Amino acid sequence: MRKILIIAPLLILMAAIAYFMIYKQMPHYALQQVEKATVKRNQALFEKYVDVDALSESLARQFVSYATRYKDAEIAGQDPQAIAREYTPELNNVFKTIVIDYIQHGKYPSAGTTVTTTKRSPEAMLMQLQDYIVNRLEFAGFSTVRIGDGYADLTADFFSPSQTSSHRLELKMADKGKYWQIVEISNLDQFLKSIESL
């Protein structure tokens, strides 16, 4: 009986440690660390769990797509691929600066950008996204869509209490061995379009 009283807590402790070590290697743990890094303004931790270069490139592509499809009459109807080739590299740098600046200071830079793809700047698009998520939508959690081939597809699920509608922001994460890293937001343009009517 005495051996059981000694061994049982050790087994429970070992199981808890094993669970934590496995959980640390799951995509949801990485998302918690991204939130923690954002709140604590910890750029090193943020960059461990978010590939800033890949995310910035993703945001730049989404911004061009959003501008060409929905917003800017000046460039609407033009070849989207030509517009993407012209503006995406510069926008990539702009978004990278914005993301890093936000992590360091907790706000988006007020300085404008020289990129003139639309009357709405990249900063305005991200601030609009933040405003909708913080003030108009309720966060319903993360859902894992698929894990395989070194990638995980997740959704950040939101709903609008005023309209009882749901909205999903799709995230792609890459398996880095001992942790997962966000590399893409794949439907930002559709997400922004879907929440504009709120």
Regions found by a protein language model. Name each.
Residues 26-42:
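Alpha-helical transmembrane signal-anchor/signal-peptide segments
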Residues 57-115:
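Structured domain cores in non-transmembrane regions
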Residues 18-26, 156, 174:
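Short N-terminal edge-element motif at the start of the domain
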Residues 4-24:
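Hydrophobic membrane-insertion alpha-helices, especially the h-region
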Residues 39-68:
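Short extracytoplasmic
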Residues 92-198:
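Exposed beta-sheet edge and beta->alpha loop/turn motif
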